[in-house]
Amino acid sequence: MITPPVAGDTFAGAPPPPSQEEDAPPYGSVVLGGTFDRLHDGHRRLLKASADLARDRIVVGVCTGPMLAKKEYAELIEPVEKRMKAVEDYIKSVKPELVVQVEPIEDPYGPSIIDDKLDAIIVSKETLNGGFAVNRKREEKGLPLLKVEVVDLLSGGAEGEKLSSSALRKLEAEKANQQEGAASKGV
């Protein structure tokens, strides 16, 4: 089901809002969220694009608790502290002047529906409806709507599948099973 856009939504390719400087990033503060397990090129692309769009601050919600329950191979997801540090370290490596706020989130919204200083939410095509849902919640709370910026994710293989932490966890589980099988056969 496609959720209709809310007033204020924009998409990649649309002109950014005017800024004080021609080359300045279009938004003061941006927000995004994700699991960020085993930080890979897809994550780095999303985080770099987000940092490039922010002038002053980037807020990143990192999923934990109930947000992980339905993930494939959830038991192999790295601890939230490790994932949060990897996100913060990467953003600081690509844009050290940004204020980086990384926090655990236990629901799909996190700080995106309470922080009135945010200007834009960064999403992938797969999470676009989540961006619209955030704006509906912000509207209900009387907060300014966020611009919605869409970043394309990288492919993870020849079949054009997106690069994913789930696929990396699956490979880790298969490798562990093969090693256990070899050990039990005395190989």
Swiss-Prot record:
An example molecular function term from Gene Ontology annotations: pantetheine-phosphate adenylyltransferase activity
For whether the record's keyword set contains Transmembrane, the answer is no
Could you tell me the EC number(s) of this protein?
Answer: 2.7.7.3
Q: Where is this region: Disordered?
A: 1-30
Q: Which reaction does it catalyse?
A: (R)-4'-phosphopantetheine + ATP + H(+) = 3'-dephospho-CoA + diphosphate
Q: Is-annotated flag, keyword ATP-binding? A: yes
According to UniProt, the name of this protein is Phosphopantetheine adenylyltransferase 1
Q: What class of enzyme is it?
A: transferase
